[in-house]
Amino acid sequence: MEHTYQYSWIIPFIPLPVPILLGVGLLLFPTATKNLRRTWSFLSIFLLSIVMIFSLYLSIQQIIISCIHQNVWSWTINNDLSFEFGYFIDPLSCIMVILITTVGIFVLIYSDNYMSHDQGYLRFFAYMGFFNTSMLGLVTSSNLIQIYFFWELVGMCSYLLIGFWFTRPIAANACQKAFVTNRVGDFGLLLGILGLYWVTGSFEFQDLFEIFNNLILNNRVNLLFLTLCAFLFFMGPIAKSAQFPLHVWLPDAMEGPTPISALIHAATMVAAGIFLVARLLPLFIVIPSIMYIISLIGIITILLGATLALAQKDIKRGLAYSTMSQLGYMMLALGMGSYRSALFHLITHAYSKALLFLGSGSIIHSMEALVGYSPDKSQNMILMGGLTKHVPITKTAFLLGTLSLCGIPPLACFWSKDEILNDSLLFSPIFAIIACSTAGLTAFYMFRIYLLTFEGHLNTYFLNYSGKKSSSVYSISLWGKEDGKKINRNFCLVPLLTMNNKKGASFFSKKTYQINNNVRNQTLITVANCALNKKIYYYPHESDNTILFPMLVLLLFTLFIGAIGIPLNQEGFNILSKLFTPSINLLHKNSTNFVDWYEFFRNATFSVSIAFFGIFIAYWLYKPFYSSLLNLTLLNSFQKWSSNPSCWEKLINCVYNWSYNRGYIDTFYKKSLTESIRRLAKQINFFDKRIIDGITNGVGITSFFVGEFTKYIGGSRISSYLFLYLSYVSLFFLFLKILN
C-alpha cells in the first residue's frame, strides 16, 4: 500500500505532456503536428484514463483501510521560513480526482467531434490538458502555498477557455469579466492565507488544524482577527464557485465552447471552491460566525440562482444559473457542518449537470443546421421546441438529467439534495423554508427548459412569438421579452408543408461555411422548391455517435451514482460514509449513523411532492401552448381563473423583469464600479499626461528657452559670460545676507 502511495505525486503531471508537446510541435513542426490532430485527442484521453484508473485504485484502498497519506519535500529551509511541497491523499482528494478524470474523459471524447470543425482544435486540447493538470494539482496539494499556485493556474486556464473564440467581442468580454471577478476573490484568498500563516506559522493542513484549534481552545489569539482571516480566505471560494455577490461571471462564461461549460462550469472549476471550503472545514468549524456566514452566502445564492433562471432564453445560461443555485446548496451544507451531504451533492450534481450541458451542446449542434452558427440563435430556446422526434436520444438523456436535478427518485440528485433539505430543517427553520421552496423553483425552471426545447412544435417557423396584439391583458411572452424587429415575418412554414414539390428534396448536400475564420463541413437537408424562392434548412438531426456515447455513459452515472450514499443496513452503512470515515471522525467524533426509515420516507415524500408541484406548474403554464398552438401569453392564462388580473400582471411582470435583468446586479456593478473606475482612470490619465508630463516637459522647455536667451545676451563673448557669472554670484550672496 505504501509502495502505491509513493507514486501519487505523478498524478497531476500525467496529462501535462499533451500541452507541452503540442506547444513545441506547433512551434517547430506545425504542419506535421496539425496532420496528427486526431492523435492528440486520443493521447489526451489515454493519459487521463491512466489517472482515472490510478485514482479508482486509491479510492478502493481508502474504503478498505481508511487512512490519510501525506508526503512532503523541503523547498527552502532557514530559521524563519520554510516552504515545502508534496501531495496529500485522503478521501476528499480521491473523490475529486475521480470526478475530474471521469467527466474529463467523456468531455474529451465529446469534444473530438464537437470541435472537429474548428481551426483551434489543437489549441483547445492543449488548454484542456493544462486545465486538467492544474485541477489535479489543486486537489492533491499538501499545503496552502501549493493550493494557491494551482488555484491561479486554474483561473488562467478558465480565462483561456472562456475566451477560446476571442475574435468574438462577447467572448472576449466574458473572459475578462471572469478574470477580473475572480481576481477579487483571489486577492482575499491570498490575504487570508498570509493571515493564517501569521497566526499559526505553518502552511501544512495537519499542522494548521492542530495549532489553530489549540489557539482557540486556550484563548491565545484575537478571535476577531481570526474571523477576518477566515472570511478573507472564504472570498476565494465565493468567487470560484460563483456565490453571491461574486457570481456575475458564471452566466457570461457560457460564451466558451459547450464542452468547456460541461467540464469547468459543472464538475471541476466551480467545484474547486466547494473543495477548498471542505478541505479547510476543520478550521472554519471552530469559528461559529464564519460557519453562519458560509451558510448565509449559500442560502442567498440558492434563491438568487433559482429566481434568475426563471426567464432565461439562452439554454446554457439557464443551466449556468442552475449550477449557481446547486453550488449554493453545497455551500449551505458546508456552513451547517454537513460535510458528507455537501460532497455527496457535489458528486451527484457533477454528473447530472455534465449530462445536461453535453445534451445542450447536442441540441445546439442540431439547431445550427436551421438557424446558423450564431449563439444568439442556436442557443435560443425561442427558436426550439418539438425536438423530441428529431433528437430522441438527446431528449431522453436530457429528460433524465432534468428529473435528477429536480430531485425525483431514484435518480442521483434526489438522494443528496434530500439530505441537505433534512439537515436544513435541523439547522434553521427559515433556511429550511427557503431551501425547500427553491427545490420547487428548481423543478419549475428545469422543466421550463425541457418543455421549451423538446415539446410542442418547432418554433423556428412561427410568425408570432409574443401573443395577440389586441389582448386586453399586458402581454408578456412565455419565451421572453417581445422583440418584433428581430422576427422574420416573411418566413412561412405553410408553403413548405402544403406545396407539391415534384422535384423533391435534395438530401445531404455538402457545403462549406465560414464562421469567424473557422471552416465547418456540414451536411444539411435543403429544399429545392419553395414559395419564397429561397433554400430552407429543414429539420434538426441527431448528433453523431461520438457525441451521444459520452452522454449515455453520464446517463448511467446519473441513474446509479446515488447508490453510493444509500444506507445498506439499519446502522446506516454506505459506501460514501465508509470512504469519508477519517474526515467525518475529525468533524463529528461521537456521531452515529443510525437510520430512521420512517423519517426518511416522510421527508423524501415531502421533498418529492415539492418537486412534482414545480413540474406540474411548469407543465400547466407551458404545455398547452404547444399542444393547441394557441398564440397566448403567460398573463392571458392567468386571466382564465384570476378575478384580479392586474395583481397577477404586476407580480409576474416584476418577477420576469427581475430574472431577465439578472436581478439588476450586473447593472449595479456597471454603474457603481465599472463606470466609476473608468472615470477615475480617465482622470488619472489626464493628470498623468497634463500635470505630471506637463511639469517634466515644462522644465525641459523652460531650460531650452533660458539657454537660448542666455546665448543671445552673451553674444558668444567670454567677457560677457564672466560678467553675467559674477553678477549672479553677487546677487546670490546679497540674497543670503538679506536673509541673515
Curated annotation (Swiss-Prot):
The chain crosses the membrane at residues 9-29, 40-60, 89-109, 125-145, 147-167, 185-205, 221-241, 258-278, 283-303, 327-347, 354-374, 396-416, 425-445, 547-567, 606-626, 718-738. One of its GO terms (cellular component) is chloroplast thylakoid membrane. InterPro entries: NADH_UbQ_OxRdtase_chlpt_su5_C (IPR002128), NADHpl_OxRdtase_5_subgr (IPR018393), ND/Mrp_TM (IPR001750), NU5C-like (IPR003945), Proton_antipo_N (IPR001516). It is found in: Plastid, Chloroplast thylakoid membrane. The keyword Ribonucleoprotein does not apply. It is an enzyme of class 7 (translocase). Disulfide bonds: none annotated. Its main location: plastid. It is a multi-pass membrane protein. One of its GO terms (molecular function) is quinone binding. Keywords: Chloroplast, Membrane, NAD, NADP, Plastid, Plastoquinone, Quinone, Thylakoid, Translocase, Transmembrane, Transmembrane helix, Transport. It comes from the Eukaryota. NDH is composed of at least 16 different subunits, 5 of which are encoded in the nucleus. Belongs to the complex I subunit 5 family. NCBIfam families: NDH_I_L, PRK06590.1. NDH shuttles electrons from NAD(P)H:plastoquinone, via FMN and iron-sulfur (Fe-S) centers, to quinones in the photosynthetic chain and possibly in a chloroplast respiratory chain. The immediate electron acceptor for the enzyme in this species is believed to be plastoquinone. Couples the redox reaction to proton translocation, and thus conserves the redox energy in a proton gradient. This is NAD(P)H-quinone oxidoreductase subunit 5, chloroplastic. The gene is ndhF.
